[in-house]
Amino acid sequence: MTSAVSSLTLRLTADGFVYLYDLSDEETEAGAQEGYHTRRQSQFVPIDWSRVSALWGDIIAQHPILSDPEGEVRVLYPASHYVVIPSGMSGEQDVHWWRLTAPIFADEEQYYSDSYALGDGKPGLAVGFSHLLKGFLQRSFVACRFIPTILPFAQRVLRQSSLQTGLSLGVELIEGGCDLVLCQSGNLLRANHYSWPRYRSWQHHLYQVLYFLSKVYLDSSVDHSAPVSIILSDGTAGTDSLVGELLQALHRQFTTADWDVSVMPIDYWYA
């Protein structure tokens, strides 16, 4: 598929993921001529979550500390269920890294908030939890800890939008699953050389998310029948297909896996 895709939704299940994407006008018209009147398409890709977990566990074990190109500041990567996703950088103003830790949410009534100062003294992160899990980011990074015990409690997280010129990240936790929403204006997620020294593409950001979600799926306290959805939205879709890039990247990463990609009936998605 060569046309641009404006959004891509991944629904993770215990045995893989379904991705649902928008069709281009040309594809929609071609489908209508064949009797298919839809603007969205869904496909299923099987994934061995234990393999994903092992692969990324090895990578993180080998590189627990990632340094910025100048080696001045380190970002520490903790254990499982912890996701750190850097945003796109807007030039020289945000090229420096800073140490980032995350709050731990233990129960429904607990409230936690903290902020992290950059070298210029500006706050970097503030996260809270009380009935609703709320997170907002004021600079370029956000960290969210996925702990299975909070999944039944939080109904949703307020989705974020248009924070500076970089990544806008929201997390929605609902009964029986959680949504991780990445909204990106422009192509910063695809080529973010400043914010991810070793893994420099948006696909690698997604790999990180898949790894930590696989840890959640492998946890015995999680209901494996509950799907997890990831929504990627490219605010200004370019000439490349998000779906095509995703599948190619996954194929490259898991070359020994059995990639039997098949079109699933539409009721699979909504079941």
Please provide the spans of the model-predicted regions.
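Hydrophobic/aromatic-enriched cytosolic interaction surfaces used to assemble or bind macromolecules
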Residues: 1-271
